[in-house]
Design a protein with these regions (language model features):
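Short, low-complexity N-terminal intrinsically disordered segments enriched in polar/charged residues
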Residues: 23-83, 203-206
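A mature extracytoplasmic/lumenal domain signature
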Residues: 94-96, 151-155, 187
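Short beta-strand edge/turn micro-motifs at domain boundaries
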Residues: 31-38, 148-150, 167-198
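Short, well-ordered alpha-helical segments enriched in acidic and aromatic residues
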Residues: 73-100
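Surface-exposed, charged secondary-structure patches
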Residues: 24-26, 102-161
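N-terminal secretory signal peptides that target proteins for export/translocation
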Residues: 1-5
């Protein structure tokens, strides 16, 4: 399907070219294709200040958890942004819920943000609330420059809390490009009544 669409597009463009050539002389050479949509097309995107943050998948994920974790206070959002591809996505899955006396029924939904939007929407929360997240197990798949990690994580309000306030899965889609690793997207969902973590997600698997 992709191939046939490509041929249709080429035929369409060829028709335009033949049409134009019948009316005027050949145009001057066009400018090089735009770099928008590539890493080179985002020169202002924060670079990783510490190459050790992004040189391995383990370091990439450890850095993400390190950046968002800590007592109430400012987070290093440039360090956070630098872990992601420009215009990468962070998606929170919102479960469906029945109506209660305090709120109406809610449909299941997905809230998707860019790294910039995530920082803007959560900055005030982190400034006034402690938040500590750590990975307890990873399931890793890899092919070529594509890596997928299901990271089982725990969240605590204070570092020394015995029990986590929540647990869930962070699903990372990661790519290797320009000599380093990047998060292309991050989706997450949490345990709740009726949805608990299976035992297989509480131990490491894969690479």
């Amino acid at each position: 399907m992709i191939r046939s669409c490509k041929f249709i597009l080429c035929g369409f463009l060829m028709g335009l070219t033949l049409n134009a050539s019948a009316q005027q002389s050949a145009p001057a050479a066009s400018a090089p294709p735009s770099a928008v949509g590539t890493l080179a097309g985002h020169p202002d995107w924060p670079a990783a200040k510490n190459p050790g943050d992004v040189d391995t998948v383990d370091h990439l994920l450890a850095t993400l958890y390190d950046v968002v974790s800590g007592p109430a206070g400012q987070r290093d959002w440039d360090r956070f942004r630098a872990l992601f591809l420009p215009d990468g996505r962070i998606v929170s899955l919102v479960p469906e819920s029945a109506a209660t006396k305090d709120r109406p029924a809610r449909k299941g939904d997905a809230i998707f943000l860019t790294p910039d939007m995530f920082a803007q929407q959560n900055d005030s929360y982190f400034k006034t609330n402690g938040f500590f997240e750590r990975s307890i197990a990873n399931r890793v798949e890899e092919f070529g420059n594509l890596i997928e990690v299901w990271s089982t994580s725990e969240i605590r309000d204070a570092k020394d809390d015995v029990q986590p306030s929540s647990r869930g899965i962070d699903s990372f889609q990661i790519v290797h490009a320009h000599g380093r690793f990047w998060i292309a997207s991050l989706l997450f969902d949490h345990e709740r009544p009726g949805v608990t973590l299976p035992a297989k997600y509480l131990k490491n698997a894969g690479l």
